[in-house]
Amino acid sequence: MNRHTDTHYPSLADKVVLISGGASGIGRAFVEAFVAQGSRVAFLDLDAEAGQGLAHALGANSLFLPCDVRDIERLKACVAEVERTWGAVDVLINNAARDDRHALADVSVEYWDERMQTNLRHAFFAAQAVAPGMARRGSGAIINMGSISWMRGRPGMVCYTTAKAALNGMTRTLARELGGQGIRINSLVPGAIRTERQDAMWAADPAGLEAASQAFIDQQMLKFRLDASDCARLALFLASDDSRGCTGQNFVVDAGLSIQ
């Protein structure tokens, strides 16, 4: 049983899926959900221990490749390895990102560039690398992970919100550029998603975690805490043939948090 959804998508069986940042959090939920659909899932991550452990648990339909997505040559090499192993990528999910907080006055040129490498640049070059194979097949789906933070103008993370806003523009432009080749590109935009990383950050203060969770729920239209499975359900739909008419769009899963 797929713990992320009871829905089965026949069109995802045997599809080759590539996910960055797949060893933990939302990315891990993606990996597990697609493997449960019968897809062949390659995933990238910096955390080799977590990645190898997940691949071992999931079996032959998963492939972990250690990768720092800031290293574009390594990223391209990983795409090539997936293609050698399973053939052209059918579904790409550009998930890797970090939303570290930072003060405006503390941002250096070096920090700015590193944040763009972490949160934006790799998404373009991953799409560039998989697009030829998708075009040869006449189909493909690319999902870019957005954020409601730029929609809300959230302070204290301007490098992150800038990168995520730019990713929205990239999604729309590439959707138009590649649509004639049967390639669909959409953004999946999460709201306040509870993950293992957040739980670890609040481990010494469980009451604080619950208070923070309740604060998000109070701002949402729907009164429950979202988790990674909510994103995984939407990703499966956007990757499947059921969403064949959807491209160039933002699909928001935030329980109404971004509506002010």
From Swiss-Prot:
Q: What induces it?
A: Is highly up-regulated during growth on sulfoquinovose, compared to growth on glucose or succinate (at protein level).
Gene3D superfamilies from the UniProt entry: NAD(P)-binding Rossmann-like Domain (3.40.50.720)
E.C. numbers: 1.1.1.390
Q: List keywords of the entry alphabetically.
A: NAD, Oxidoreductase
Please indicate if the UniProt record lists Oxidoreductase as a keyword: yes
Q: Which PROSITE patterns match?
A: ADH_SHORT (PS00061)
Stated pH dependence: Optimum pH is 8-9.
Q: Name one GO molecular function term.
A: oxidoreductase activity
- Catalytic activity line of the entry: 6-sulfo-D-quinovose + NAD(+) = 6-deoxy-6-sulfo-D-glucono-1,5-lactone + NADH + H(+)
Q: Does this UniProt record's set of keywords contain Ribosomal protein?
A: no
Between which residues do disulfide bridges form?
Answer: none
Matching SMART domains? PKS_KR (SM00822)
The active site lies at: Y160 (proton acceptor)
Q: Which residues form a coiled coil?
A: none
User: InterPro entries per the record?
Assistant: NAD(P)-bd_dom_sf, Sc_DH/Rdtase_CS, SDR_fam
Entries under Pfam families matching the protein = adh_short_C2 (PF13561)
Domain of life here? Bacteria
Function of the molecule? Catalyzes the oxidation of sulfoquinovose to 6-deoxy-6-sulfo-D-glucono-1,5-lactone, with a strong preference for NAD(+) as the electron acceptor. Is involved in a degradation pathway of sulfoquinovose (SQ) that allows P.putida SQ1 to use SQ as the sole carbon and energy source for growth.
Q: Which family does it belong to?
A: Belongs to the short-chain dehydrogenases/reductases (SDR) family.
User: What is the protein named?
Assistant: Sulfoquinovose 1-dehydrogenase
> What is the scientific name of the source organism?
Pseudomonas putida (Arthrobacter siderocapsulatus)
